[in-house]
């Protein structure tokens, strides 16, 4: 196991069968370079399993800044503000639309196997309030099969190198 910046993976080209990126992309300095590196290290036929925050989710889960002070927690509706204002309140983390993600993969030798938006498992709520948490999870995950899935917590993409 190695620790490295996502933009400069210390692996040989075409050396990996799978790159698993779970809620990482939004934290890197150069997301386009990080995606390019993921593709570079994949063998042909290798896959990226990518999860990253959806701009359509009604809460900013990474907290926000207000008057120079950081406030931890889920903040409602920040992601729905105009992008310039949203980025001032949450400059430490990126969020993505489907088009934003597609742009990151543009021109790379890949094909898309799965592209959808998902809601979370809400295990932390289930742990504290089991009945409510399970009801909430069931309801929100049922929304994944409706047009309201665009409000999901995260993008889940499976991308294959060709």
Identify the function of each model-found stretch.
Residues 3, 29-37, 47-158:
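S-adenosyl-L-methionine-dependent methyltransferase catalytic module, highlighting the catalytic core
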Residues 7-18:
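A short acidic, Gly/Pro-enriched loop at the edge of an enzyme's catalytic core
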Residues 21-24:
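A short beta-strand submotif of the Rossmann-like class I SAM-dependent methyltransferase core
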Residues 161-162:
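Generic C-terminal helix-cap and adjacent flexible tail
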